Amino acid sequence: IIFLDFNGMNLINEDYGAHPEFYNALTAVQEGKVYSQISFRSSASNLETALADAYYAACVMYPQQFQDIDPVEKAGEIFTKLLGSNPYHDLEEAGYAFCQITIGA
């Protein structure tokens, strides 16, 4: 399983164009197990986003153990608790969401 930060996807996709054989040799790419991670580091660390990313990763990596957790709902709870509001849908509209990624697309 590979998790990628959306802010680096342009570079990854550009590199994929130059080296597709490298990426296509990765088991996670072959098995469609490449997932997003919402950027939590810009000019400072955004703890709330890092926590939401951690729950999402846990849900992807351990689906049985986290089957009762909806990562989007959990992100909303975390954001609301730490920020006083839930910006997840704003992030989603801007292209930052929990999802599978196809490298090179």
Region spans (language model):
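Extracytoplasmic/secreted envelope proteins and their assembly/folding machinery
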Residues: 51-58
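Binding-cleft/active-site segments that stabilize strongly anionic ligands or cofactors
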Residues: 1-51, 65-67, 73, 77, ...
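Short, hydrophobic alpha-helical segments
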Residues: 58-65
